Structures are given as C-alpha cells and as structure tokens.
Amino acid sequence: MTDNNIENNEEEIRKAPSANDREELTELKAQIEELKDKLIRTTAEIDNTRKRLEKARDEAKDYAIATFAKELLNVSDNLARALAHTPAKLDVEVINIIEGVQMTKDELDKIFHKHHIEEIKPEIGSMFDYNLHNAISQIDNTKYAPNSVITVMQSGYKIKDRLLRPATVQVTKKPKQEE
C-alpha cells in the first residue's frame, strides 16, 4: 500500500496544474510585480527625500548667519566711513585710534570672507543690474551710456549666491534734447 500511495503521489505531481492553480499563480505573479513596483517607487521616494533634506540642511548651514550678517553690514560701513574721514593733522593718539579702527575693519572683513560674504561695489560706468543694485536716482550724463552706475552711495553684500543688501547707486539717464 505504501508503493501504491507513492505511485498516486507521483501521478498527482505529474498532472498539469489545474485552472485554479494557474489562476492562483497568475495572481501571485501580479502581486509580486506590484510589490516590486512599490519597492522601486518607495526606494526612489526615500532617495529623493534624503537628497531634499541634505539640500535643506546645506542651505540652512550656509545661510543661517544671514540675519546676523545683515546687522553687521552697518558696522562695517561705519568703520569704512570712519577710516575715510581721517583728519589731515594727526597726533600719536589719533594715529593709534585709526590703526585700531583699521584692525577692527580688517578683522571683520576676514570674518566676512570666512563665511562667504562678499562686498558688491560696482565700478563707475558699469551697467545697472537690478539683481545687485538699488538705484535711488537718475542723473543726466553724456559721458556714460544710459543706466550706467555713476555713483555708489552704499556697497551691497551677498552671501554665496544670496543677496544680503543691494548696492545703493545713482545711474545715468540720457539728457533731454534741447529744442
């Protein structure tokens, strides 16, 4: 009887899968394909999220000091103004004060450079760039092309590629023709 059972089992194994089995197999294959697709999409979504978070982290790190840096810009401007207006007659005490102000300005400039803060100081005669400059007035001028920077009132600054403060400038305009 044991041999008989073995023969029966072999016959069952040799039999072609039934329609039910084929249906079940087709369903299982479809489920496998669906799960593979979900896995691929989930993996891609995780990768995109990781990249987005890395970019946000890098931007936060790069621009975290922007607000603080904006507040220091006026300090830098005031130090530069103080150095630009040194008296003609200098005694030892005034020279020492000027040297101290210069050292402070130099140190602040080093810190700006360390944190990728660049001064925007347009050349006289260069074209006005609304991305970097703020024009406060237009002046008749024939020496330079219209919309050229004629006066820099205040330097601008940027941190990496982000503008902290535009340079304040006066630009030329084409003079009116006399009739």
UniProtKB/Swiss-Prot annotation:
InterPro entries: GrpE, GrpE_coiled_coil, GrpE_head. Residues 1-22 are annotated as: Disordered. PROSITE patterns: GRPE. The keyword Cytoplasm applies. Transmembrane segments: none annotated. Disulfide bonds: none annotated. Its main location: cytoplasm. It is found in: Cytoplasm. The keyword Cytoplasm applies. GO terms for biological process: protein folding; protein import into mitochondrial matrix. GO terms for molecular function: adenyl-nucleotide exchange factor activity; protein homodimerization activity; protein-folding chaperone binding; unfolded protein binding. Keywords: Chaperone, Cytoplasm, Stress response. Residues 11-22 have a biased composition (Basic and acidic residues). Homodimer. PANTHER family: GRPE PROTEIN (PTHR21237), GRPE PROTEIN HOMOLOG, MITOCHONDRIAL (PTHR21237:SF23). Participates actively in the response to hyperosmotic and heat shock by preventing the aggregation of stress-denatured proteins, in association with DnaK and GrpE. It is the nucleotide exchange factor for DnaK and may function as a thermosensor. Unfolded proteins bind initially to DnaJ; upon interaction with the DnaJ-bound protein, DnaK hydrolyzes its bound ATP, resulting in the formation of a stable complex. GrpE releases ADP from DnaK; ATP binding to DnaK triggers the release of the substrate protein, thus completing the reaction cycle. This is Protein GrpE. The gene is grpE.
